[in-house]
Amino acid sequence: MAIPLLSDPVTSTLSAADRATGLPVSAERALVRRAPRERLRHLARVRRNKAVARSLMNRFGWRSAAQYRCLERLWTHESHWNERAHSPSGAHGIPQARPGAKMAAAGPHWRSSARTQIRWGLRYIRARYATPCTAWTHWQSANWY
């Protein structure tokens, strides 16, 4: 007569979620501990990018809070203010320029520099829509700008 095992020594050390993901418990815990720090870094980067945009908007003559709110909404929808954002269609950066290389006209570090991307995006908005609110209005009706 075989004696049944009370528990499998390998699977008993893994939670159901760990077994589903295939990650060892220690790796899962490390991800959970790291997540808040990465979130804080992301939020700090977003705040910094928005501050850069606010500063540059003044140079374009867009000083009103309304124009800033329009730009904030527009680029939140486009990229969540992430300078590393990349869409499947090939759009890149905070303003989601397509192709991303168009932003090279604003500076050599267009792939990674939020300031370069924001400068290019504000120039694009001025040339095509005149103001961030006009660009936002277009985005609301067409889901692109």
Regions found by a protein language model. Name each.
Residues 1-69, 134, 140-145:
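Intrinsically disordered, low-complexity
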Residues 46-145:
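Peptidoglycan cell-wall recognition and remodeling modules
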